[in-house]
């Protein structure tokens, strides 16, 4: 589940590199999972929901792991193949796990390294010093801890008995 902040909820045409709209989908992903206009919040949300369900299922089939909140975030961030590679090969260098995916093989080593290091928290960069040292296990643990922390904060903020 993805929770949007109030600031994000109104940035329908937001772009981050090649990712567009409310749920930051690429044009390819939107064409595959949705229809209509990528910047239309309803169309973007429907495509994202279909993408999240489909990729969580593929991840579970591949890894035999139930997609937790943190795994779902990892799937959204790294793609289902990237997330599956990270989870199933925790001792491998993380960028090499990305290069083991279809997209990684297509885009190459430089892209794989960027996909990891640009999504690594500063504190973890300080500990590991280099993308060439960061393991998939450490990368997964970093996001698990971050998502679990945010989920706990959100859960505490929602009144008991609420439907949120």
Region spans (language model):
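Low-complexity, Gly/Ser/Thr/Pro-rich intrinsically disordered linker/tail segments
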Residues: 117-164
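Catalytic glycan-binding domains that act on GlcNAc-containing polysaccharides
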Residues: 1-115
């Amino acid at each position: 589940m993805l929770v949007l902040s109030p600031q994000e909820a109104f940035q329908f045409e937001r772009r981050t590199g090649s990712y567009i709209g409310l749920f930051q989908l690429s044009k390819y992903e939107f064409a595959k999972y949705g229809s209509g206009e990528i910047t239309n919040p309803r169309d973007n949300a429907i495509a994202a929901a279909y993408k999240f369900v489909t990729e969580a299922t593929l991840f579970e089939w591949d890894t035999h792991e139930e997609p937790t909140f943190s795994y779902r975030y990892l799937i959204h961030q790294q793609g289902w193949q990237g997330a599956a590679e990270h989870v199933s090969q925790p001792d491998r260098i993380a960028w090499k796990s990305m290069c083991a995916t279809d997209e990684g093989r297509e885009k190459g080593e430089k892209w794989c390294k960027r996909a990891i290091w640009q999504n690594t928290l500063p504190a973890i960069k300080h500990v590991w010093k280099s993308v060439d040292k960061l393991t998939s296990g450490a990368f997964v643990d970093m996001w698990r801890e971050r998502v679990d922390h945010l989920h706990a904060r959100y859960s505490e903020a929602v009144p008991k008995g609420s439907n949120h």
